[in-house]
Amino acid sequence: MANNEQKRDEGYIEKLVQVNRVAKTVKGGRIFAFTALTVVGDGKGRVGFGRGKAREVPAAIQKAMEAARRNMIQVDLNGTTLQYPTKSAHGASKVYMQPASEGTGIIAGGAMRAVLEVAGVQNVLAKCYGSTNPVNVVYATFKGLKNMQAPEAVAAKRGKSVEEIL
């Protein structure tokens, strides 16, 4: 699993999570192609992921990066950590993420770590259960981050004060 990181002029951090060779069987044999899974973020709560497929690795990575920039979401962070513990699943992959105190760092594995790093989360405890397929882990992590809301937003929706919610 590659963990390549680049900073672009737009201020986005780009990470390559996975490159995979796939084959299409045709009458004359096999046609090989490559798929790429990437995550892109600004380190301040905006994060996106993308998948690309092409005959050559660089082209697949480029397509994945473009898809990731189009698929960005805003995550409500509590400083450098998450708002509250959260669980999420996609397919057979289940992820659990919980906020951590300052100085803890990112305690997460593989694909989940890449997503949290580019999102700007610096202190978190995370665990992946079930399938560790990077594609499903990234989807599950995104679901968890997307569904997380700041207490202020929840209070505003309910028409109550933050103190009443907490």
UniProtKB/Swiss-Prot annotation:
Q: Which Gene3D superfamilies match?
A: 3.30.160.20, 3.30.230.10
GO MF entry, a single one: rRNA binding
What residue stretches are annotated with the S5 DRBM domain?
Answer: 12-75
The N-acetylalanine modification is found at A2
Arranged from A to Z, the UniProt key words for this protein are:
Acetylation, Ribonucleoprotein, Ribosomal protein, RNA-binding, rRNA-binding
- Write one Pfam family the protein is assigned to: Ribosomal_S5_C
Question: Could you tell me the Gene Ontology terms of the biological process aspect for this record?
Answer: translation
Q: Which GO terms describe its cellular component?
A: cytosolic small ribosomal subunit
Q: Does the keyword rRNA-binding apply?
A: yes
Keyword Ribosomal protein found:
yes
InterPro entries according to UniProt: Ribosomal_Su5_D2-typ_SF (IPR020568), Ribosomal_uS5 (IPR000851), Ribosomal_uS5_bac-type (IPR005712), Ribosomal_uS5_C (IPR005324), Ribosomal_uS5_N (IPR013810), Ribosomal_uS5_N_CS (IPR018192), Ribsml_uS5_D2-typ_fold_subgr (IPR014721)
Per the entry's comment, what about the domains? The N-terminal domain interacts with the head of the 30S subunit; the C-terminal domain interacts with the body and contacts protein S4. The interaction surface between S4 and S5 is involved in control of translational fidelity.
Q: How does it assemble?
A: Part of the 30S ribosomal subunit. Contacts proteins S4 and S8.
The entry sums up its family as follows: Belongs to the universal ribosomal protein uS5 family.
- State its role: With S4 and S12 plays an important role in translational accuracy. Located at the back of the 30S subunit body where it stabilizes the conformation of the head with respect to the body.
Protein name, UniProt field:
Small ribosomal subunit protein uS5
Native source species: Pseudomonas aeruginosa (strain ATCC 15692 / DSM 22644 / CIP 104116 / JCM 14847 / LMG 12228 / 1C / PRS 101 / PAO1)
- Whichever gene encodes this chain, its name is rpsE
